[in-house]
Amino acid sequence: MAELRLPPNSVVKKGKEHKEQEEMLKPRKVKIYRYDPDLDENPTIDSFEIDLSKTGPMVLDALIKIKNEIDSTLTFRRSCREGICGSCSMNIDGTNTLACIKPIEEISGDIKIYPLPHMKVVKDLVPDMSHFYAQYESIEPWLKTDSPTPSNSERLQSIKGREKLDGLYECILCACCSTSCPSYWWNGDKYLGPAILLQAYRWIADSRDDHTGERLEDLEDPSKLYRCHTIMNCTKTCPKGLNPAKAIGKIKSLIAERHGV
C-alpha cells in the first residue's frame, strides 16, 4: 500500500495574535501567512488588529503599517505603489492581485493575505520568481531583426501595427495569472503559463520583428503551449485587465495556419 505524506513543514498552524491596546474607530483583523525557512518550522497564520482610520485605503497600506508599527520582521515586496511594477503581487481574500491597488473596502470580514500559490516561498509573502523569470528569458523577449538598425532613426511602426500590441505590452510580469492557473500548477516545469505566453505573443504580433516563424516553431510543443485548457482563471485574475487566454488562442491559430488548418 502506498504511504502518502505531506512535505516537511507544510502544515499551516495558528500563529501569533497581535491585539491593539488602544480603542479603535475602524477595527479590522488582518491574517497573514508567515514562513521563515531558516527556522525549520511550520508556516503560521499571524493575526493583527489595526485601525483602518489610521492607515491608507489599500491592502499594501495595511501591510506597511503592520511592518512599521507592529512587527518589523514581516517580509513582502513592494515598490511603485501604483500597479506598475508588479512587485506586491500576492493572494488577497482568495484572489491573486496587487496589494497596492486592492482596496480594503472591497474585502468583507478579516483580510486574509497569502503569498502567490504554486511558487516556493522565500519568506512570508515573498515568492521565488526564479523559474518564472527563466521561462520569460526562454522566449527571447526582445526585438529580433534581420535588417540593420537605421542610423538616424528608430525602427518605425504604423499606427495600426502599434495598435496590435494593445492589451499585450501592458503586462507587468506580476505572475498573478500564471499562479492562478491549475495547468501551471500541474505542469509548471514545462508549461510556460499564461503570463509568458502573452509576452511571447506580444513579440509575435510586433510588426517590427522578423522572426515570427522561429518564435512560433519554438512554441509548437505539447507542453510549452498546449497545456492551456482555457480554464480562464488567468483572465479573471489579471490586475491590469488583460486577456492572456486570448493571446494563447492567437498563438494556436497562427500555428494552425502555418500547417494549412
From Swiss-Prot:
Question: Which coenzyme or cofactor does it need?
Answer: [2Fe-2S] cluster; [3Fe-4S] cluster; [4Fe-4S] cluster
Which residues are listed as membrane-spanning?
none
Q: Which reaction does it catalyse?
A: a quinone + succinate = fumarate + a quinol
**How many cofactors are bound and how?**
Binds 1 [2Fe-2S] cluster. Binds 1 [3Fe-4S] cluster.
Positions binding [4Fe-4S] cluster in this chain are C171, C174, C177, C238
What are the binding positions for [3Fe-4S] cluster in this chain? C181, C228, C234
> Keywords on this record?
2Fe-2S, 3Fe-4S, 4Fe-4S, Electron transport, Iron, Iron-sulfur, Metal-binding, Oxidoreductase, Transport, Tricarboxylic acid cycle
One GO MF annotation is:
4 iron, 4 sulfur cluster binding
Q: Where is this region: Disordered?
A: 1-23
Record-linked InterPro entries: 2Fe-2S_ferredoxin-like_sf, 2Fe-2S_ferredoxin-type, 2Fe2S_fd_BS, 4Fe4S_Fe-S-bd, 4Fe4S_Fe_S_CS, Beta-grasp_dom_sf, Helical_ferredxn, SDH/FRD_Iron-Sulfur
- A Gene Ontology biological process term: tricarboxylic acid cycle
- State the top-level EC class: oxidoreductase
Asked if the Swiss-Prot or TrEMBL record annotates the protein with the keyword Transport, the reply is yes
Q: What is its EC number?
A: 1.3.5.1
Which amino acid positions bind [2Fe-2S] cluster, per UniProt? C80, C85, C100
- Domain 2Fe-2S ferredoxin-type per the UniProt entry, residue ranges: 28-119
For the ligand (a ubiquinone), the binding residues are W186
Q: Which residues form the 4Fe-4S ferredoxin-type domain?
A: 161-191
Its annotated pathway reads:
Carbohydrate metabolism; tricarboxylic acid cycle; fumarate from succinate (bacterial route): step 1/1
What is the protein's quaternary organization? Part of an enzyme complex containing four subunits: a flavoprotein, an iron-sulfur, cytochrome b-556, and a hydrophobic anchor protein.
Which NCBIfam families does its entry note?
A: dhsB, PRK05950.1
**Which PANTHER family does the UniProt record give?**
SUCCINATE DEHYDROGENASE [UBIQUINONE] IRON-SULFUR SUBUNIT, MITOCHONDRIAL (PTHR11921:SF29), SUCCINATE DEHYDROGENASE IRON-SULFUR PROTEIN (PTHR11921)
The record's comment on protein family reads: Belongs to the succinate dehydrogenase/fumarate reductase iron-sulfur protein family.
Q: What protein am I looking at?
A: Succinate dehydrogenase iron-sulfur subunit
Per the UniProt entry, what species is this protein from, by scientific name? Answer: Rickettsia felis (strain ATCC VR-1525 / URRWXCal2)
Which lineage ranks, top first, belong to the organism behind this chain? Answer: Bacteria, Pseudomonadati, Pseudomonadota, Alphaproteobacteria, Rickettsiales
Query: Its encoding gene is what?
Result: sdhB
